[in-house]
From Swiss-Prot:
Disulfide bonds: none annotated. The active site is at 157 (proton acceptor). This is C alpha-dehydrogenase. SUPFAM superfamilies: NAD(P)-binding Rossmann-fold domains (SSF51735). The lineage of its organism: Bacteria, Pseudomonadati, Pseudomonadota, Alphaproteobacteria, Sphingomonadales. Substrate binds at residue 144. NAD(+) binds at residues 10-34.
C-alpha cells in the first residue's frame, strides 16, 4: 500500500501510545481513521485532537476481547464510511510483570485474552470483510520484541506476542492472493502508558500472582519514558506498510541479541550428514503432501463456489 489517501484505517488501542501515533501519521497521510479503544473518554479526546489536525476520524469504544462488540464495531465502520477498512492495525495490548511460577489463571486469561485473542478477534472479524470488498489492503499487528524469546518475568505476554508473530506470518501467506499485505511490528520500549494497563484489568480477572501497585507502575514508567516516540514508531510502521515488509523492527540496539538468539537455534539443528536418507524421505513426503494439499483445497473451493 503506497497511497493512504481516503483509505479507512481501523486502529485498536488507537486513543493513546503506539495506536494514537499511527492514527496521526496515517491520518496526516490522508487516511480516514477509526479510533477503537476500551476507554470512552480517551476515545473522545483522541478523535477531537485528530479532527483538530484536519483528519477525518471516528471513535468506537471497544473491548477487543468481546467478539460480539467487535462485529458491531465492524458494522458501524461500514455504516459510517460505506466500506470495510482497507488498513487494519491490531495495536491494543496490556502487560503485567511477575515471576512466571506465580502466574495465575487470571493472569493468563487477561494478558493472553487481550494480546492474542484480541488480535484473533480482529482478524476473524475483518479479514472476510476485507476480502469481500475486493479492495487491496494491509494488516499490521503490533507485537513485541518479547515475542521472539521467552521471559521469566513476562511469561504470558511473551507467549501471546510469539503467537501473534506466528499468526501474522501465516496470514501473510494466505492473504497475498487477495492483494492484502500483512506486517508485524515488534517494538522494544515505546513511550506510552502501557505501565498503567493494570488499572484497566477487569475485576473478573482480578486474582494475580504479581505485585501490582503504585511502586511497580512507577518502576515500569521509568523504562517506558525513554522508549521510542509513538509517532516515530508509527512512521516506521507506515514505511513497512508501504514496502509490504513482513517484519518491522526500528530498534538497532536489538540486532545483536536477536542474532545470538536465532544463532543458538540454528546451531541446535542436526547436521545433514547425521541422517541424509531420512532427511531426503521426509522432504519428499512433505513436498508431495504440499502438492496434494493444493489440489484438495482447490477442489474444495470449487465445490463451495
Amino acid at each position: 500500500m503506497k497511497d493512504f489517501q481516503d483509505q479507512v484505517a481501523f486502529i485498536t488501542g488507537g486513543a493513546s501510545g503506539a495506536g494514537f501515533g499511527q492514527a496521526k501519521v496515517f491520518g496526516q497521510a490522508g487516511a480516514k481513521i477509526v479510533v477503537a479503544d476500551v476507554r470512552a473518554e480517551a476515545v473522545e479526546k483522541a478523535v477531537a485532537e485528530l479532527e483538530g489536525l484536519g483528519i477525518t476520524a471516528h471513535g468506537i469504544v471497544l473491548d477487543i476481547m468481546d467478539r460480539e462488540a467487535y462485529a458491531r464495531a465492524a458494522d458501524e465502520v461500514e455504516a459510517v464510511f460505506g466500506q470495510a477498512p482497507t488498513l487494519l492495525s491490531n495495536t491494543a495490548g496490556v502487560n503485567s510483570f511477575g515471576p512466571i511460577e506465580k502466574t495465575t489463571y487470571d493472569d493468563f486469561d487477561w494478558i493472553i485474552g487481550v494480546n492474542l485473542n484480541g488480535v484473533i478477534n480482529g482478524m476473524v472479524t475483518f479479514v472476510p470483510r476485507m476480502i469481500a470488498s475486493g479492495r487491496p489492503g494491509h494488516i499490521v499487528t503490533v507485537s513485541s520484541l518479547g515475542g521472539f524469546m521467552g521471559s521469566a518475568l513476562a511469561g504470558p505476554y511473551s507467549a501471546a506476542k510469539a503467537a501473534s508473530i506466528n499468526l501474522m506470518e501465516g496470514y501473510r501467506q494466505g492473504l497475498e492472493k487477495y492483494g492484502i499485505g500483512v506486517s508485524v511490528c515488534t517494538p522494544a520500549n515505546i513511550k506510552s502508558n502501557i505501565a498503567e494497563a493494570s488499572r484497566l484489568r477487569p475485576a473478573k480477572y482480578g486474582t494475580s500472582g504479581y505485585v501490582e501497585n503504585e511502586e511497580s507502575i512507577a518502576s515500569l514508567h521509568s523504562i517506558h519514558q525513554h522508549g521510542l516516540e509513538p509517532e516515530k514508531l508509527a512512521e516506521a510502521i507506515k514505511k513497512g506498510v508501504e514496502d509490504n515488509a513482513l517484519y518491522i523492527i526500528p530498534y538497532p540496539e536489538v540486532r545483536e541479541g536477536l542474532e545470538k538468539h536465532f544463532q543458538a537455534i540454528i546451531d541446535s539443528v542436526a547436521p545433514m550428514e547425521s541422517d541424509p536418507e531420512g532427511a531426503r524421505q521426509r522432504v519428499e513426503a512433505l513436498m508431495a503432501w504440499g502438492r496434494d494439499r493444493t489440489r484438495v483445497f482447490a477442489e474444495g473451493d470449487k465445490k463451495g463456489a
